[in-house]
Amino acid sequence: MSRQQEGGGGLLPRLKLAQDLLRRTGVWQLIRAWNPVIAGTIPLDIDTDASDVDVLCEVHDPDTFVRRAMELVRFPGFSLLRKQDTDPPAIVCRFIAEGLPVEIFAQPTPVTEQRAYRHMIAEKRLLEAAGPDAATEIRRLKTLGIKTEPAFTELFALAGDPYLTLLEVPDWSDNQVTDTVRRARRVRSECPFCLTVDADSDVTVY
């Protein structure tokens, strides 16, 4: 499938594919009451063949949500987990729909305040400032087995824990984003092998 955006400012083909899939299979209608949003790599056009369709929901009535989510047991690979190690606790539902892996992540937090959404906004800002070649490089790093957030901290020479560092980017000024992109280009041009990521531990190494 082409990664070029459809004419007339339409949706990216893979994002439209994901939306159509969720509606066609009845998943979207099932979770619509919880403000679902497709997040992750697909809306940014940096997904790979192994990428999930990530859906975020705002859920303040977890028992009701779980009862509805259990209707998805008809899909292969179904699992549902209540996670207590997140703040706040979350519900994660996974399954395969027409060959595509889907993950629904639900928390009692507005979607726009959830970590995964803020990561997506951070990545969007960096990609827009860096230009289309950046998305190509992120996909290349992901095909090497590097997860999305560590791939961004490698490409943009960001120090610290990738998952925490990216949470700061949505609050940066435009100048901060631009300066970060320029600095990363300088670092990579002066020493292209100085910045690596340990794909097994997700630790950024300088």
Task: Label each residue range with its predicted role.
Residues 68, 106, 115-118:
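A short secondary-structure junction signal
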Residues 112-206:
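Catalytic cores of NTP-dependent nucleotidyl/adenyl transfer enzymes across multiple folds
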Residues 25-64:
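Active-site nucleotide-donor binding segment shared across nucleotidyl transfer reactions
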Residues 1-39, 197-206:
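Helical scaffold of the NTase/Pol beta-like nucleotidyltransferase catalytic core
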Residues 70, 101-110:
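Active-site ExK catalytic segment of metal-dependent nucleases
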Residues 37-39, 56, 94-96, 103-105:
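Residues in well-ordered beta-strands of folded domains
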Residues 75-82, 87, 91, 103-107, ...:
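Conserved His + Asp/Glu catalytic blocks
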Residues 9-23, 57-98:
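Metal-dependent nucleotidyltransferase catalytic core
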